[in-house]
Amino acid sequence: MEQPSSRLPFFTRIGTRVIYHLYITDTVVNYTGKARPAMAINGSIPAPVLTFTEGDSAEIYVHNLSMMETSIHWHGILLPNRYDGVSYLTTAPIEMGGTHYYTFPIKQNGTYWYHSHTMMQQQSGMYGAIVIHKKNEPRAKEHTLLLSDWTDENPEEVDRSLHNATDWYGIRKGSTQSYAEAIREGHFKTKIVNEWKRMNAMDVSDVYYDHFFSNGKPENHAMGFKAGDTVKLRVVNGSSSTYFWLNYGGGKITVVANDGKDVEPVVVDRLLIAVSETYDVLVVIPENKNYAFTATAEDRTKSTTLWLGMGEKVAADTMGRLKYFEGMKMMNDMMKMNGEMNDMGMKMSLQKMDMNTVMYPEAGGTKEIVTLNYAMLKSTEKTTLPDAPTKTFTFNLSGNMNRYVWTIDNKTVSEADKIMIKKGENVRIIVYNGTMMRHPMHLHGHFFRVLNGQGDYAPLKNVLDIMPMETDTLEFAATESGDWWFHCHILYHMMSGMGRLFSYEGSPVNPEIGDPVKALKKVYADDRKFHAMAKLGLESNGSDGELQFANTRWQLQAEWRIGLTKENGYETEIHAGRYLGKMQWLYAYAGFDIRHRKMEEPEKDLFGNINTKDDRKVFCIGAEYTLPMLVKAGARFDTDCKLRLQLGREDVPVSKRLRFNFMANTDKEYMVGFRYVVTKYISLSTHYDSDMGLGAGITITY
């Protein structure tokens, strides 16, 4: 591997030419007492800040010294399509040992950032800030703050776990919302209604994080400020999936720019910065003390702080634990039995009505808290579009939290056609969020107007946070060429397929990506990926288990039970099938069933027929449907002309770590059991099986 001493200088300026050399390497970090693999740029996480002045010409060499291909996307930067940095869509991937050269004119100013757009590399450390100064701009007192999230887990393992509906992250965060917790907090009915409507525990975030960082540290310091200074903070949310509440121990926050674009100053007590957004804010240092600018994760599990100034520390207001059952009660009212949201006659948009307020402990206090919303943002200059034909699209953000499927109009990127637009026309997008989570929707290569009631001065953005049940309208002038991604910037939602590709008609293909058909298949591969899940019970009465491979629609599943005696016998079922419907409550499958158990006399099933459950080799077809209370109802018919009906459920949350399972069918088989979660992969378990009897031991879950 190339040694650092042989590297070219990080920064060189020759007139208006600004040249950077970025070196991507694999590295090892230790943030929690455990060494973990990561990826760094020029040896640091976050990557170094890239600084330009409007009118410069950027020349950036990205050298890949890591052990995998990579990419760099210049988030919010207006540039030629071939340099946008999405591997196989706009730009060739940077292969191991390779170098990619980017060059583009700097024709904007503001706060932006850059990050990998390959697999889960952003979560592993590949992100950095970009600062573009205005021409002849007086240098103010300022500081760049890049916020991020960190997990010791391999991000690929996080993604796999989310797709397998693990509640381990809920256990770690204290957001399980079990029946014991519901009873203790007087919300037993709330929990029943929640599961009656086929919902799992509600949360505001998906992943448990070990740390949140301010410029790479849980606490960081900017000491060069004194009493009376007004400090401009350029805040970048470079996290993979965390929204942050921003508040300041020294008083009010004045917002002066969003996503790199200036807005009329807005004074607030706090603001929520969405994943991938940037804000420029002004704060005043009241006295010669050390004031906290704190970013608290939206789920309020942890926070990170940048200390401004020197001397006695002055903390920002702490944000209390969320009242999850109050949120669950609200969500019950908004959710219909068919899984769709009911706005109850409220027309919500622009973050003006935060439905999560019922969960905020501070909401009932006497202090009035001014929180930023998009309706407050007004551009400092007119942003009207040119007079041109307008093409309108309506998008419904959709998803299935139980199976971790995130879509637009119930289709992933790979399932939908490209959206064709023409250069010279205006494009309007009406977006409705029909899911229970917020989504920060990012458009590559363009700024869009957010229609927020400010008329000609509607703010320009490249990321729009859309809350549940909100409808927002954005519009932009189609002035580019090529393919541009519009996607949710929560990394795990994007990789699941929540996005669309806007494609300019008649655009040439970048020859660097090779065969465009093969290249596009690689783009689509992300949301077509199969994820593995396994469960192995090792108990005193035998072993039972499950192995599963599934993606957005399809699933291959094998189940088995092996007793310790001939009387206990063995059985296995293997099914391949497809999930159907928007909520994927229906699963249709085909497969086979092989089993044998030594019995003295044949039994009959509930239909009065000779029961073949103890000696069976059959092919079968069937379906499984999720009923209220998340009970799975199954019906299957086999080549022996036998019908079997079945009811069951796994992982009823009795307490924070205790789970209850049950199953019964018309073959007169039944099972009841408990599982106590010790770690993510190990549980203590016990169950009674009608064929295998009572057993106890451990269950290994992957």
List PLM regions with ranges.
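Outer-membrane beta-barrel initiation region
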Residues: Y504-T565, K598, K617-I621, Y670, ...
